Amino acid sequence: VYKRQVQMGTRFVTTEECDAADAYKQAYLSARKEDIVIVKSPVGMPGRAIQNAFLEKVAAGERFMTGCRHCIKTCDPKTAPYCITRALINAATGDVDNGLLFCGSNAWRAQKIERTVDIMEEMA
């Protein structure tokens, strides 16, 4: 039996139930289509993220690699521009100017904070 499936993490970031900081959610609500960019993470994998002050500093050559815990084998603290763990924690806890805001390609479509149950009913 074949069933169609989708991955919809981005849609649930801007829900009341999501525990990300309000500033993180607001970054999604404020994002424009052209703000969604492909970044190369310190572990070498590409990902989509919302362009912000942090990514601008990284693009300008600033490094944010302190206190490496060697949590990801493919990350080399000698060459990585930033600690991905720290950047993700910064963003999720509300320090969006010093964090990495991973997102899906449709993050810019977020219009409001809504309840998960309402999203699920809309999809039913």
Predicted features and spans:
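Conserved active-site-proximal phosphate/metal-binding subdomains
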Residues: K3-A124
